[in-house]
Curated annotation (Swiss-Prot):
The active site is at 120 (proton donor). Catalyzes the decarboxylation of 3-oxo-tetronate 4-phosphate to dihydroxyacetone phosphate (DHAP) and CO(2). It is an enzyme of class 4 (lyase). It holds the Pfam family Aldolase_II. This is 3-oxo-tetronate 4-phosphate decarboxylase. Its EC number is 4.1.1.104.
Length: 217
């Protein structure tokens, strides 16, 4: 099986897993992966839970549609990430409930939507900035994310959800899951008296994670 065929299968497998476990619903969300001669990306308005590998769109490095169904309307956003971060080999975007709710309720900080609650959030995710609301597919989002792609592993789109990039489709999905579960934890606990003041890991713990695991915090 060729690398492209394997990536098509992986995109569909990871998409189905995310859908079945409630990280996205309906036809929301998209996944892409880097190829030597372009990218694969899920089709526009496709349900991540029921995709055909042959229908996954192939796009050339110049952005032209090569094969498969029509590419996602967020193609420009995915391309901005790949063009500005050579280590990014996959991008996953979902409309995950707790992360969208977080943008409605108010994020922790604009440059860090969540505090460093757990060691695995610090190790696997790191800083996640908020991108103010724009309509789906707005070029302004791609332009903003292009400036951040090499600095962070993801962003949170206001009212739309997370966009996460990593070295593989599975690693991007794992990071997105860690991000969503941390948002769930924060949304569950943040109104508990005294919690917000002691929620973040102390500076010493963050230094230890940076030294031991090269954590980005």
């Amino acid at each position: 099986m060729s690398t492209e065929s394997k990536l098509r299968e992986e995109i569909c497998r990871i998409g189905a897993s995310l859908y079945q476990r409630g990280y996205t619903v309906g036809s929301a969300g998209n996944i892409s992966a880097r190829l030597d001669d372009g990218w694969l990306i899920t089709p526009t308005d496709a349900c991540l839970g029921m995709m055909d590998p042959a229908a996954v769109a192939k796009v050339a490095t110049d952005g032209s549609w090569v094969s498969g169904d029509k590419p996602s309307k967020t193609l420009m956003l995915h391309r901005a990430i790949y063009d500005n971060n050579r280590e990014a080999h996959a991008v996953v975007h979902t409309h995950s409930t707790h992360l969208v709710a977080l943008t409605l309720a108010g994020v922790w900080q604009p440059d860090d939507v969540l505090p460093p609650l757990t060691p695995y959030y610090v190790m696997k995710v790191g800083h996640i900035p908020l991108i103010p609301y724009h309509r789906p597919g707005d070029p302004a989002v791609a332009a903003r994310v292009a400036t951040l792609a090499a600095q962070v592993r993801g962003v949170l789109l206001e009212r739309l959800g997370p966009v996460v990039w990593e070295s593989s489709v599975s690693r991007a999905a794992f990071a997105l899951e860690e991000l969503e579960e941390t948002a769930k934890l924060w949304m569950t606990m943040k109104d508990t008296p005294g919690f917000a003041a002691r929620a973040a890991l102390p500076d010493g713990a963050l230094t230890e994670l940076r030294d031991a695991f090269q954590a980005r915090w």
